Amino acid sequence: METKKGSLDWKNLQYDLQPWIKEAIASLGFPTMTPVQAATIPLLSGNKDVVVEAVTGSGKTLAFAIPVLQKVSNRLYDSQEEGEAPEKVKQGHMLAIVLSPTRELASQIQSVFNNVIEYLPEDKIPIKTQLLVGSLSTVRDDLDRFLKDKPHILIATPGRMLDFMSSQYVKMNSVEIAILDEADKLLDFSFEKDVVNILKRLPKQRRTGLFSATISAAGNTIFRAGMNNPVKVAVKSKSTTANSAPSALHISYLMIEPEKKITTLIKLLHDYRYKKCIVYFPTCTSVKHFYSIFQKIVNGNDNTESFKFYSLHGQLATKPRLRTLQSFTDGDVALNKHILMTTDVAARGIDIPDVDLVIQLDPPTDPDVFLHRCGRTGRANKVGRAIVMLNDGSRELDYVDFMEVKGVAMQEMPTPDLNQSDHQQFQDKLRKYMLDDRARHEIAIKSYVGFVRYYTKHMATSIFRYQTLDYLGIAKMYGLLRLPKMPESKYIPNDNMPDDGWLGEPIDMDKYSYADNQQEASRLENLNAEKIKKIADAKRRKELKVKNEAWSSKTETKETKQERREKMKRKREAIEKQIMEESSDDEETKVDWKDIVKSNKKKKANSGSMQGSFDDL
């Protein structure tokens, strides 16, 4: 939709908003609309379903928050006759729902709604919101609060919303508008079933809005959202017709050896001027691993400037996650450089002020997430810088062309001048850090294995080929002392494979201890039990050997007897042959020697019989 510069003034909005909403917008400091707001608010506030695709940081949240509040206000305040009390919403009913793929984004959306609602006049019925996300509270607690507070707007993640709706006390008949934020994610295989089931239970006459920076990735699944003749609103960057990123966002890539990624990251964090930075890691374990390393090594260096690190990942419970995000948002930029170390849990929709720099240690497995990550900076026309590290010596350079086809242009940045002695010094500190606690090395191994699994799940398999991955470089980056046994190790060339997998000086693993006394005591107990078992196994093997030797001797005795039998047989055959040779040459009178023996015995018997007869006389 084309919009002239003058038309972005709120006075020129082609829809008459509630007076209190106009005052709230002015008080919040929004002098003009963004293009996506100018195009979307009139449509969604009226009777149109919308599919909105706009670059990150373009004001999408306010573009649907205002229409939602407008519809709720119309329902609460315009339905009353003069002098009559306003019509209240029935028990167990709500007027609007907003679905979000993550808890953090849902919490942030609620904050946007509440910021506007603060300016609601006191003589009006209070508009209430409720957050429904997993782990923050039980479904039962959510239901009790819902029935007690009677909120008008529910902001939820799909799973918790579906569980909440299963209660007989929850009625969906009054819902007038439904919003799907980050709709491409909500309509992919991980959420689609839950989202479709939720939308099926809503009134057919409701209004529906789908919002995302990459809505086209959802394809035909958007038609399963139950919309009626939706209007598509697409707002692109003016910098280039093919660029999906905002013009104020500069995206660069850096070709670097895997082993030097962390030292390069540290140098970037030192050298760049920024207030807040988000660093994306591939897995939850890697966030925990490197967060601990940076706290101990980087912040422990007296020569460094002051850094404030935060850890945020999907394995954290909901309350710590929201608390961490709030602490990072509220961080005083005058005192420290603030660095959030996170996964894709903070890739979508999160709007944090003063984020000037985004660094990706590795590209995401889903190319659509790449732009969402980068979009955490360069928001609301503010200049932002995003950097992605690509593994040198691989085909990952093709990722640049791959993303350009998808409308994301990147520029190569020169490799930072990294002092080899500084790199070696960090590696020495990292090794000492590992040797101080066996538990650290176990986390390092989990991080390394998790990264390998992560790498094999890349959608662009022709670019990210795990057969050619620099496994040794990655292992050194994670600080491993020794390579773990895993199938992928077969891709390491034999010439490069270290002896017995050791990446440095071998150590005695039996003496490699935990820093935690309880863990170490348990390890020693298991080690002692294992030694006892080994001794018992050795004794049992020795007994079996003796038993096997006795059986072997018995076998030899049997073999000796067999040899004697065969010797006797040969001797007997020789006697037979001799007798045959001594027999008469007359072939007709040849007599078998056995017959002769029998005959002689018979004669003796007969003679004995006759002697006996004569004796009787």
Swiss-Prot record:
Presence of the UniProt keyword RNA-binding in the record: yes
Motif Q motif: positions: 10-38
Domain Helicase C-terminal, residue spans: 261-421
One GO biological process term: maturation of LSU-rRNA
Record key words, sorted: ATP-binding, Coiled coil, Helicase, Hydrolase, Nucleotide-binding, Nucleus, Ribosome biogenesis, RNA-binding, rRNA processing
Binding site for ATP: 54-61
Region (Disordered): 547-617
Chief place of localization: nucleus
InterPro entries: CTT_SPB4, DEAD/DEAH_box_helicase_dom, Helicase_ATP-bd, Helicase_C-like, P-loop_NTPase, RNA-helicase_DEAD-box_CS, RNA_helicase_DEAD_Q_motif, SPB4-like_CTE
Cellular-component GO terms for this entry: 90S preribosome; nucleolus; nucleoplasm; preribosome, large subunit precursor
Biased segments, Basic and acidic residues type: 555-566
EC number(s) reported in the record: 3.6.4.13
Coiled coil: 515-585
Reactions catalysed, as given in the entry: ATP + H2O = ADP + phosphate + H(+)
Residue stretches of biased makeup (Polar residues): 608-617
Motif (DEAD box): 181-184
Every Helicase ATP-binding domain range: 41-233
Enzyme class: hydrolase
Membrane keyword on record: no
Subunit structure: Component of pre-60S ribosomal complexes.
Domain notes: The Q motif is unique to and characteristic of the DEAD box family of RNA helicases and controls ATP binding and hydrolysis.
Family: Belongs to the DEAD box helicase family. DDX55/SPB4 subfamily.
Protein name: ATP-dependent rRNA helicase SPB4
Organism: Scheffersomyces stipitis (strain ATCC 58785 / CBS 6054 / NBRC 10063 / NRRL Y-11545)
Gene that this sequence comes from: SPB4
